[in-house]
């Protein structure tokens, strides 16, 4: 499993994390409980959705 860099503390309370890949690493962008919204944002920024477990 790849580590997401600079994850905000509040994100631990959300089910989906949106991250953007930069130089081969994932960087935190935001967090949502709504999968559709997380997917929408990921598409907008060229990122990906990771389930926060």
Regions found by a protein language model. Give the residues of each.
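Glycine-centered tight beta-turn/hairpin loop motif at sheet-sheet or coil-to-beta transitions
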Residues: 23-25
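Local beta-strand/beta-hairpin segments that build beta-sheet-rich folds
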Residues: 27-29, 50
């Amino acid at each position: 499993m790849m580590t997401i860099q600079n994850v905000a503390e509040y994100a631990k309370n959300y089910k989906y994390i949106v991250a953007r890949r930069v130089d081969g690493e994932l960087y935190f962008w935001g967090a949502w409980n709504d999968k559709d919204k997380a997917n929408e944002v990921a598409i907008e920024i060229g990122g990906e959705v990771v389930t926060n477990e």
